[in-house]
Amino acid sequence: MVLSPADKTNVKATWDKIGGHAGEYGGEALERTFASFPTTKTYFPHFDLSPGSAQVKAHGKKVADALTTAVGHLDDLPGALSALSDLHAHKLRVDPVNFKLLSHCLLVTLASHHPAEFTPAVHASLDKFFSAVSTVLTSKYR
């Protein structure tokens, strides 16, 4: 999915507003994912998946850091996320549908923390961005 110049502006502006909360929001989005879609827990059998878990928060920070990298490379997502795509496709073998589930929970988390900024245009831009990231992360599955 191609991001328009307006989408790129919206994504960058939103990520700037998130600032130092990206890791926190990543952890919260993972908690939402595990609660809403329990089958996603199967990829983390060694984690304490209880609310507020340090392991979930740490992995949420990894997710947020990867998204921050993607935001910094909106014109070359495949290049920026190539190693992560290899990891998820070849080593972790994450079912691609899980990226959509996490993307949804990321949108909910961001909307709950920034309701005034979460306009329909921003929502659409972030949805397209998360979809583009998901597409890149699943590109090596073929």
Curated annotation (Swiss-Prot):
Coiled coil: none annotated. One of its GO terms (molecular function) is peroxidase activity. Heme b binds at H88. GO terms for cellular component: blood microparticle; haptoglobin-hemoglobin complex; hemoglobin complex. PROSITE patterns: GLOBIN. Disulfide bonds: none annotated. GO terms for biological process: hydrogen peroxide catabolic process. The modification N6-acetyllysine is found at K17. Residues 2-142 form the Globin domain. The modification N6-succinyllysine is found at K8, K12, K17, K41. The modification Phosphoserine is found at S4, S36, S50, S103, S125, S139. Keywords: Acetylation, Heme, Iron, Metal-binding, Oxygen transport, Phosphoprotein, Transport. InterPro entries: Globin, Globin-like_sf, Globin/Proto, Hemoglobin_a-typ, Hemoglobin_oxygen_transport, Hemoglobin_pi. Belongs to the globin family. This is Hemoglobin subunit alpha.
